[in-house]
């Protein structure tokens, strides 16, 4: 005789709740991006933040004229509830509230009309912080949905402005990835 398992409405509800909880725990969905900045298989999104900040440029003298050169970003990244997740600064680097840090290097870019390009960055180095390791397992970072941040008009960089800096407002969404199956 085969064993018989009686499944009642309560059992079905418990199973359904477990399935929904597992789906919710799966983490944020991967964004739809151009092929040039797609993250390789074997990675999954674990954190998404909306950046609000500035791209900093310096006016420099160059052979035959003057030019605005990129210096660094300065931004805060927030979650969907408006809670601060990380700060973003030169390197390019991101530091979480727990002190963990990731430094990225640009792998590729996708141009965007009227804004700084979308980027794929690989984690060049990571470290845990004194209070946790939120960013310590990062493998890739994507910068997408950019607005603003472009260098000032070339004409505004001249002999009278050499050595000055300009802070240009920008926003972007940053997706942080880790290897599938990695910790935290």
For every predicted segment, state its role.
Residues 27-54, 63-184:
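Primary mode marks residue(s) on the alpha4-beta5-alpha5 output face of response regulator receiver
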Residues 11-19:
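Bacterial N-terminal signal peptides
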Residues 1-11:
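Bacterial N-terminal signal peptides that target proteins for export
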Residues 22-26:
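Sec/Tat signal peptide C-region and signal peptidase I cleavage site
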């Amino acid at each position: 005789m085969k064993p018989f398992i009686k499944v009642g409405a309560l059992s079905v509800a418990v199973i359904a709740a477990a399935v929904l909880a597992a789906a919710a725990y799966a983490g944020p969905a991967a964004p739809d991006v151009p092929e040039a900045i797609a993250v390789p298989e074997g990675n999954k999104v674990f954190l998404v933040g909306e950046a609000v900040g500035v791209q900093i440029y310096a006016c420099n003298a160059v052979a035959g004229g003057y030019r605005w050169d990129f210096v660094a970003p300065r931004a805060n990244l927030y979650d969907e509830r408006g809670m601060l997740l990380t700060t973003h600064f030169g390197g390019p680097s991101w530091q979480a509230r727990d002190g963990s840090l990731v430094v990225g290097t640009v792998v590729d870019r996708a141009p965007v009309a009227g804004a700084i390009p979308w980027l794929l960055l690989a984690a060049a180095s990571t470290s845990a912080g004194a209070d946790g390791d939120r960013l310590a397992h990062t493998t890739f970072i994507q910068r997408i949905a950019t607005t603003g941040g472009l260098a000032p008009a070339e004409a505004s960089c001249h002999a009278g402005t050499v050595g000055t800096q300009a802070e240009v407002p920008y926003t972007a969404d940053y997706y942080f990835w880790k290897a599938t199956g990695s910790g935290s």
